[in-house]
A protein has these predicted regions:
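Residues that form or immediately flank small-molecule/cofactor binding pockets and catalytic motifs
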Residues: 13, 43, 55, 67, ...
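Glycine-rich beta-alpha loop elements in corrinoid/cobalamin-binding modules
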Residues: 1-52
Length: 195
């Protein structure tokens, strides 16, 4: 309906957007290429392209979004960071919980990238993970890393209160003040909404 929009990338855009840009740079129409996840209006006015949203199967294929050249402008700033995608819940009103699956970036890579932020004196690393504490095998080693790091960097985590245990309480007590900031994801207090 909006004639100012040529293309829409549905779902996770890393692969589809790259393919679309490559097609356009090579003088091709991104709609004729039938790129999964790309839809738009052809010059004729007809809607064309893929109708399915794309999901990146292997998160390790997604490159680290920050480069050395950016850091001069980003030092002492807030950086958004993702260590997982998806949500284990299926709240009716939420876009993130539509599949009840969570995928994780490789943990070794995550530690390396967090250390990179620390080395570059980032003020805050704001995790955009929907539910940071949804999987103990994933979040506990990272919280230990945050606790033990020699840094002034603050880590902002969105956590589900019902999934917090004595372990999380203990590690927060052992962590230097101001190191970890928790945002509790209270979705609703209305039982009917939650059902």
């Amino acid at each position: 309906r909006c004639h100012a929009v040529d293309y829409v990338v549905q779902g996770e855009g890393e692969e589809a957007f790259y393919q679309l840009i490559s097609a356009l740079q090579n003088g091709k129409d991104g709609l004729q290429e039938e790129i999964p996840g790309v839809r738009g209006r052809h010059i004729s006015g007809e809607l064309m392209g893929s109708t399915e949203a794309v999901e990146v199967k292997d998160l390790s294929t997604i490159p680290f979004p920050y480069v050395e050249e950016d850091m001069e402008d980003l030092e002492h700033k807030i950086i958004y960071y993702e260590s997982s995608r998806g949500c284990p819940f299926s709240c009716q009103y939420c876009l993130s919980g539509n599949k009840n699956t969570v995928r994780f970036f490789p943990q070794e890579r995550t530690f390396k990238e967090l250390q990179w932020f620390i080395d570059h004196k980032v003020k805050q690393v704001k995790f955009v993970d929907r539910t940071f504490n949804c999987a103990p095998h994933h979040h506990r080693p990272m919280m230990e890393f945050m606790r033990d790091a020699n840094t002034e960097t603050n880590f902002h985590l969105e956590m589900e209160p019902e999934l917090m245990t004595e372990w999380e309480t203990q590690i927060l007590c052992e962590t230097p003040p101001g190191r970890i900031q928790i945002e509790l994801g209270v979705q609703s207090t209305h039982k009917k909404t939650l059902d």
